[in-house]
């Protein structure tokens, strides 16, 4: 597998090939996932919950993210590395530029930020200075207190139409990738069809251009709860690398997510 870039992912969308993405937080797992052929690794601020034992992603700092990005970078040869910008690390453009620089210097090839069209100026500023951006709509975990919990988003028509408009605006601002989380499958399909850039779904149906899972869910090592949109691939294989290879295959062939993983 050749080195994956943002251009590679766009080419996959144009060819109708599915993109497989997973989270990782250290060199050892990153190396296994890279060798398995995963297209992109996200160093997610989900580390606050799955590594640190927090009840949300809000306590995660930019220093945490830079540390884990450096760790992942050491294990990766070909996979695209995306790093989350944590809560309040991009509250204004100046702050966003400084913190994105930390993550890029730590080894990221792209940064991910959560939010709608209000981020247009920030995204443009980052892209103009050479920082590729992955946007994130739907259930954005950094806004959990606004949503009143981890809930499916975009179920009523007004909010669905707003999300489509936001997605188009984020693409126009320069975002090169879009994560869609916990939205009805029909909305995931509509947004994907409306955009030129690839969409990566997590609980967003099977018609997005790719899928992403938190590694702890995909490997069945989540402590207390398996999300509806996830599947334990390790249970089917008994081997971590084979589990990720199965995940990639199931996404590629359109078998994952199945109907049982989809929100209506």
Swiss-Prot record:
Q: Which InterPro entries match?
A: Pantoate_hydroxy_MeTrfase, Pyrv/PenolPyrv_kinase-like_dom, Pyrv_kinase-like_dom_sf
Q: Where in the cell is it found?
A: Cytoplasm
Q: Which GO terms describe its cellular component?
A: cytoplasm
- Catalysed reactions, semicolon-separated: 3-methyl-2-oxobutanoate + (6R)-5,10-methylene-5,6,7,8-tetrahydrofolate + H2O = 2-dehydropantoate + (6S)-5,6,7,8-tetrahydrofolate
Which CDD domains does the entry link to?
KPHMT-like
For the ligand (3-methyl-2-oxobutanoate), the binding residues are 45-46, 84, 112
Q: Where does Mg(2+) bind?
A: 45, 84, 114
Top-level EC class = transferase
Quote the EC number.
2.1.2.11
Query: A GO BP term, please?
Result: pantothenate biosynthetic process
Arranged from A to Z, the UniProt key words for this protein are: Cytoplasm, Magnesium, Metal-binding, Pantothenate biosynthesis, Transferase
The record ties this protein, via SUPFAM superfamilies, to: Phosphoenolpyruvate/pyruvate domain
Specify one Pfam family.
Answer: Pantoate_transf
Cofactor binding mode and count = Binds 1 Mg(2+) ion per subunit.
Pathway(s) of this molecule: Cofactor biosynthesis; (R)-pantothenate biosynthesis; (R)-pantoate from 3-methyl-2-oxobutanoate: step 1/2
Superkingdom of the organism of origin: Bacteria
Cofactor(s) annotated in UniProt: Mg(2+)
MF terms in GO: 3-methyl-2-oxobutanoate hydroxymethyltransferase activity; magnesium ion binding
Catalytic-site annotation from UniProt: 181 (proton acceptor)
**What family classification does the UniProt entry report for this protein?**
Belongs to the PanB family.
Record note on quaternary structure: Homodecamer; pentamer of dimers.
Query: What's the stated role of this polypeptide?
Result: Catalyzes the reversible reaction in which hydroxymethyl group from 5,10-methylenetetrahydrofolate is transferred onto alpha-ketoisovalerate to form ketopantoate.
From the Swiss-Prot or TrEMBL record, give the protein name.
3-methyl-2-oxobutanoate hydroxymethyltransferase
Source organism per UniProt: Colwellia psychrerythraea (strain 34H / ATCC BAA-681) (Vibrio psychroerythus)
């Amino acid at each position: 597998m050749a080195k994956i870039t943002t251009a590679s992912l766009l080419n996959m969308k144009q060819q109708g090939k599915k993109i497989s993405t997973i989270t990782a937080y250290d060199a050892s797992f990153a190396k296994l996932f890279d060798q398995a052929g995963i297209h992109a690794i996200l160093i997610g601020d989900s580390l606050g919950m799955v590594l640190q034992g927090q009840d949300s992603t809000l306590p995660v700092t930019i220093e945490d993210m830079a540390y884990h990005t450096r760790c992942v970078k050491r294990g990766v040869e070909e996979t695209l590395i995306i790093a989350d910008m944590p809560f309040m690390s991009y509250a204004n453009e100046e702050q966003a530029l400084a913190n994105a620089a930390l993550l890029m210097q730590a080894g990221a090839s792209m940064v991910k930020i959560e939010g709608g069209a209000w981020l247009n100026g920030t995204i443009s500023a980052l892209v103009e200075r050479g920082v590729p951006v992955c946007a994130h709509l739907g259930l954005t975990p950094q806004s959990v207190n606004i949503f009143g919990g981890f809930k499916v988003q975009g179920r009523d028509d007004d909010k669905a139409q707003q999300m489509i408009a936001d997605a188009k605006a984020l693409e126009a601002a320069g975002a090169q990738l879009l994560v869609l989380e916990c939205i009805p499958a029909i909305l995931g399909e509509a947004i994907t069809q409306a955009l030129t850039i690839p969409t990566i779904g997590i609980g967003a149906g099977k018609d997005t251009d790719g899928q992403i899972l938190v590694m702890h869910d995909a490997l069945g090592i989540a402590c207390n709860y398996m999300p509806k949109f996830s599947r334990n691939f390790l249970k089917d294989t008994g081997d971590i690398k084979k589990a990720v290879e199965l995940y990639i295959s199931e996404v590629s062939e359109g078998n994952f997510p199945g109907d049982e993983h989809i929100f209506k």
